[in-house]
Amino acid sequence: MISFTQEIELFLKEYSIGHKFITVEGITFIQSLHNGVLICPIDKNWFEMDNPLHKGELMNRIRREHSDVTIIYIYEDQWHFHKTLTRGRLLSHLGLQKSIFARNCIIKEISQEQAAAFLQKNHIYGGTKAKYRYGLFRKRATGGQETLMEQTPTLVAVATFSSPKEIDGYMSYQWERYASLCGTRIVGGMGKLLNYFVEKQLSLGQSVEI
């Protein structure tokens, strides 16, 4: 039986992604030769190993020393139970997904049912009830590296926010969920949705903190 790290290696080979192994004090990373992303496989025995405090300190040190490099943590249970989502997320960080530019999208308020259905398919933790729900709809394409689209505006990303709580004179909101269409990277999507939400609350005369 192959290890979880070997499973990920086989997946990378399927997509012809060059990589190398890096081991730091017993923790094995796989580094993409394509864009330098560090992949940290977390198997089912990860939290049962000796000296978890040392491991946590080591991971913090690695993050500090490689602050210019993206580190992706892949959990074995999610890899097996959410195959499409976890693999799509990994490919996105490796720069191998289709791209859609947020500037070619419009934002609309969506229903709880729309948000829940989209998140159930495209977010590892599924949907959740939220006070505010917004969808990013693709309206046009500009060609180039952007993927082709149908004529009808398509829901490509969803963001949800909680009800506000007043803290020190500010209305504090929690960003509960964000997900893009599986297999697709929305360039600028998170920023566009967040800015829209903040500006809308400010227009209502509220001081906002997220």
Listing of model-derived features with the role each one plays in the protein:
Residues M1-F21:
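Acidic-basic catalytic patches of nuclease active cores, encompassing PD-(D/E)XK
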Residues T5, N51-M59, M190-Y196:
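Well-ordered, non-membrane alpha-helical segments in soluble/globular domains
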Residues V24-I42, R133-Y134:
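Short acidic loop-to-beta-strand element that houses the catalytic metal-binding Asp/Glu
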Residues H34-G56, P164:
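Short beta-strand-loop-alpha-helix junction that forms the active-site gateway
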Residues K44-D50, Q78-H80, C182-G183:
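Short acidic, S/G/P-rich loop/turn micro-motifs used as interaction or catalytic elements
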Residues N51-H82:
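Catalytic cores of nucleic-acid endonucleases
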Residues L85, R89, L94-S207:
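A conserved beta-strand-loop-helix scaffold within acyl/acetyltransferase catalytic domains
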Residues I210:
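Conserved beta-strand-loop-alpha-helix junction that forms the acyl-donor binding cleft
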